[in-house]
Amino acid sequence: MGAAGYGALGVAFALVSYLLVTVDLGLDPFAVQRVARDPAGLPSLLPQVVKLRLAASLGAYALLGVLTSILPSQVVGGKELALIYGGRLFSAALKANWALRGRDEMGQVAAGMLLQNLLYAAGIFALVRCPEPSAIRVPILFMAGEAVLVLWYLGRLKAAYPRLWGAPAQNGIAATLLRDSLPVAASKTLRLGFHEGDLLLLAWLSTAAQAGFFLVGHRIVTALASVALLFQQSAFPSLSRLSEDRVGRSLDFQRSVSRGILLCFMPPIVTGAVLGDPLVRLLFGEEFAPAGAILSISLAAVPLLALSAGLHNCLLARGRPRAVLAATGAGTLVHLLLGLAWIPDSGGLGAARALVCGEAVVLVLSSLLVWKRWRVLAVDAATLWILAASGLMAAILWQSEGIWLGWRLLLGLGAYLAAVLFSGALRPHELRRLLEG
């Protein structure tokens, strides 16, 4: 397919992702919170959420049809690709991962995602070995994985609730959730500007090939960020219950979660940032070599995103969705302005720089809002030590260029672990102590 074909797939996917917010409606945090506090009420809640989202998905798909008819092909990435990816609007309405999260069954959520990705990867593996691989088959394979994921989630819930769809509805639940969730839906729409928005800007202000380079460079970033956010999401039900008690305790819990995420994720982030160019050449081939620099820059956004997501969990659990909207909106505005300034000249590199700057603004403002409301620092000394240890690892990897790669990685990782252990930032029993308390 080449960089241009890869970029067309990414642009079509990005367009559908924007419409996906009109189906999601920002309901997940509040639905998760309700299930975490009252698991027995799930059979009454699930049908209302699904019906509301299915109605929204019909309108969103109709809008997608209009957009693919009136917008230039480089903006939509191809009408057929966008319309097939549009099936996500319906699978999103049926996905019940939020119900499993509320029941603290993150293992089932992760297992479903793993199954989906394995099936998708197997399909792509078979596709690239076809004599003439067609781009149109990629969204078809993706939607097959989505269907499996929907059935997996509903099957897990059906096993726990035999009368999942037969419970009497409680009037007003969906309306109450929808009213509370609108700021979250707006925040999610703005948040899409940090990846999907970049792809659309690149397709508009640059070329499909540049969008393809950005998508390849951002593929590893997205994988790491998705797992980090999955850990943050798994903590939200417990955080919701803790938030009914003392505020300080819930904030301590969230800082511990964020610190654990950084502790595990900083070594691969640093390694990818330093070795981005050879890593992209190895995984995607010489044709996508320009994506190496994009990967190196974009990886800096992962720890920023992980920390800000933790702060947003605290704000949402305490009923402050408008604070999340304010921080996300400001970061998105900075990101958009920088993207408009840098993308025409620098392409994917400009988009990557704008992405990191926007994420930094979101984190700073979120930290200030948490401090203003509760007078609690969002980042503690142990977290700063982890970041400092990451800087030491990066310096060793850079300075040891020329020796065998295995020794470079061992030296860098050894220095990182030594610095973390020396600082006392490694606290393996802290999360368990907080949960038991």
Residue ranges and their predicted role:
Residues 18, 66-100, 140, 148, ...:
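Alpha-helical transmembrane segments of multi-pass membrane proteins
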Residues 1-11, 37-48, 59-90, 130-139, ...:
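Membrane-interface helix-capping segments at transmembrane helix termini in multi-pass transporters
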Residues 3, 102-103, 130-132, 205-208, ...:
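Helix-loop interface residues and adjacent transmembrane-helix termini in multi-pass membrane transporters
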Residues 115-116, 120, 138-158, 170-241, ...:
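Transmembrane helical elements of multi-pass membrane transporters/channels
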Residues 1-28, 61, 65, 120-121, ...:
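Signature of the first transmembrane helix
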Residues 395-437:
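Membrane-proximal transmembrane or re-entrant/amphipathic helices at the cytosolic face
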Residues 79, 83-86, 110-161, 218-221, ...:
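Hydrophobic alpha-helical transmembrane segments
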Residues 35-49, 213-329:
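Specific pore-lining/lateral-gate transmembrane helices of multi-pass inner-membrane transport
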